[in-house]
């Protein structure tokens, strides 16, 4: 869960960020997860190809790295982000999807995952 300035409210979102020059999406995902949550991405099971964030408004693209994380949550290392990481059961996610705001891609992934 993180505070996003544009909507001016807290939304549920996956850790994310820009891919630095010379980084692969997998290296970037490991770095971003560590920076934003303190967790280590220790196993990658899939990398989902490029998609557009808002195809009608922007050429910004996304990639999704799927894997397993371990460790203890730690405060974000960024002074520009307010992030509250957490673990959720599938039942908790199904309830959150009914009552809380999500980033669009996070909402879609959580919907599918929570029903498996």
Stretches with model-predicted labels:
Residues 108-116:
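Short, amphipathic C-terminal "tail helix"
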Residues 12, 16-106:
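Unchanged
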Residues 1-9, 13-16:
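A glycine-rich, hydrophobic loop/mini-helix early in the fold
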């Amino acid at each position: 869960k993180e505070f996003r300035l544009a909507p001016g409210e807290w939304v549920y979102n996956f850790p994310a960020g820009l891919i630095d020059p010379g980084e692969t999406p997998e290296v970037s995902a490991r770095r971003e997860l560590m920076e934003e949550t303190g967790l280590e991405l220790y196993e990658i099971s899939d990398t989902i190809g490029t998609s557009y964030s808002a195809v009608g408004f922007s050429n910004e693209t996304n990639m999704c790295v799927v894997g397993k994380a371990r460790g203890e949550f730690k405060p974000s290392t960024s002074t520009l982000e307010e992030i509250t990481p957490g673990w959720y059961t599938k039942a908790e996610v199904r309830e959150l999807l009914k009552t809380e705001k999500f980033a669009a891609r996070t909402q879609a992934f959580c919907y599918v995952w929570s029903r498996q």
